[in-house]
């Protein structure tokens, strides 16, 4: 995942009224990438996707999706 690409997607989404979040798009991108990477590691070490699924649902909710 390219962080610069994600920042531009977040900026466009916010400007278009599709995404809703506080703070800088660059910080939001770091939050998203870190959350997904951590969730993937936890899912792998715990033998299931439940933690990853929960994290992705939360991320979507955090951005109003």
PLM regions and their residue ranges:
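Generic detection of well-ordered alpha-helical segments
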Residues: 4-8, 30, 34, 57, ...
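Short, charged alpha-helical segments
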Residues: 27, 50-58
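Short, hydrophobic secondary-structure boundary micro-motifs
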Residues: 18-23, 44, 51-53
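Amphipathic C-terminal alpha-helical segment
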Residues: 12, 33-50, 62-65
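Residues within alpha-helical segments
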Residues: 3, 14, 29-30, 40, ...
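Amphipathic alpha-helical packing segments from all-alpha helical-bundle domains
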Residues: 1-15, 27, 64
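All-alpha amphipathic helical-bundle segments outside canonical DNA-binding/catalytic cores
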Residues: 15-31
